[in-house]
Amino acid sequence: MAGHSKWANIQHRKGRQDAKRGKVFTKLIKEITVAARMGGGDPNFNPRLRLAVDKAKAENMPSENIDRAIKRGTGELDGVSYEEARYEGYGIGGAAVMVDCLTDNKTRTVADVRHAFSKNGGNMGTDGCVAFQFKHCGQLMFAPGTSEDALMEAALEAGAEDVVTNDDGSIEVITAPYEYSNVKDALEKASFRAEFGEVTMKPQNETELSGGDAERMQKLLDALESLDDVQEVYTSAVMDE
């Protein structure tokens, strides 16, 4: 990705997430509840729940909030029942966009997502229109200057699928979704702490945007991320600083 800094884009995305901390607890509670409902209440045997609980702890969510969310998911406590929904579409320059939601009213959610697309220069598409452009995987990002050879050896030994060194010197470790936590833990034991990590939908090809197009694309992403029912927004767009 000549002319673009993968590290800068990751940091920019993380900054956007940090700026929206007011919504973080709500989204995490939803994810914990759904993960527990689908896979059981023990994080040791439910990788999705373990990841959600780890995220919640990283955000300093009180343990009693986490426990209540798990119990709502397992049915031990009453609570709202959320459904998963995914919407796909196109942003500026044809950039692929995928929106993952947890909702108690799909009619409301699809209307809100469609409105955000159309109001901000995007176009909501049909199911499957862009999903094939993304790979479901774990991603751990290490800062430029990290020892490439040592990290690669430790990552592959821990079960990572791939290790990629970017043009800006940052290093990405790619894992299977269900191996993300195991690889992350193994690397931390080997003294490699990622600056950023998540289970994500990684674009297979990137759409480079700059200037006004990048600004318009950012506005679309912000509009989608601000919706109450939206959990994650993935895009193939890579924007200049």
From Swiss-Prot:
Its main location: cytoplasm. InterPro entries: Integrase-like_N, TACO1_YebC-like_2nd/3rd_dom, TACO1_YebC_N, Transcrip_reg_TACO1-like, Transcrip_reg_TACO1-like_dom3, YebC-like. It comes from the Bacteria. It is found in: Cytoplasm. It holds the Pfam family TACO1_YebC_N. Residues 1-21 are annotated as: Disordered. Keywords: Cytoplasm, DNA-binding, Transcription, Transcription regulation. GO terms for cellular component: cytosol. Belongs to the TACO1 family. NCBIfam families: PRK00110.1 (NF001030), PRK12378.1 (NF009044), YebC/PmpR family DNA-binding transcriptional regulator (TIGR01033). This is Probable transcriptional regulatory protein AZOSEA20720.
